[in-house]
C-alpha cells in the first residue's frame, strides 16, 4: 500500500521531517517514491514551518495513497492556511 508519511531528518534534538510518498513496507527513512513537502516543528521567526506541494499530494491521494494520521492533520492545516 502506498502511504504519505513523515521521514525524519535533522540532527539530534533538532527534528526536521520530509513528507514522502512511499510503500508502507519500506523503512521510515528508507526508499521513497517522491518527496512532496517538509515540516519543521521547531521553526522560529521567519522560517517556514510547513511546505506542501498540494498538486502532487492531491494526485497521490487520487491514486489511492493513504496519509498517516499526522500527515492528514498537516494537510488539513496547510489547506486552511492556503485558503
UniProtKB/Swiss-Prot annotation:
Keywords, in A-Z order: Ribonucleoprotein, Ribosomal protein
Keyword ATP-binding: no
Keyword Ribonucleoprotein found: yes
SUPFAM superfamilies, A to Z: Ribosomal protein S16
GO CC terms, sorted: cytoplasm; small ribosomal subunit
Single Gene Ontology MF annotation: structural constituent of ribosome
NCBIfam families: S16 (TIGR00002)
Designated name of the protein: Small ribosomal subunit protein bS16
High-level lineage: Bacteria, Pseudomonadati, Pseudomonadota, Gammaproteobacteria, Pseudomonadales
Gene name of the record: rpsP
Amino acid at each position: 500500500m502506498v502511504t504519505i508519511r513523515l521521514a525524519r531528518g535533522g540532527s539530534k534534538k533538532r527534528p526536521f521531517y520530509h513528507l514522502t510518498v512511499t510503500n508502507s513496507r519500506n523503512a521510515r527513512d528508507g526508499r521513497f517514491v517522491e518527496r512532496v513537502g517538509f515540516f519543521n516543528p521547531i521553526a522560529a521567526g521567519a522560517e517556514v514551518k510547513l511546505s506542501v506541494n498540494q498538486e502532487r499530494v492531491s494526485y497521490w491521494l487520487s491514486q489511492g495513497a493513504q496519509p498517516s494520521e499526522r500527515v492528514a492533520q498537516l494537510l488539513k492545516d496547510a489547506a486552511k492556511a492556503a485558503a
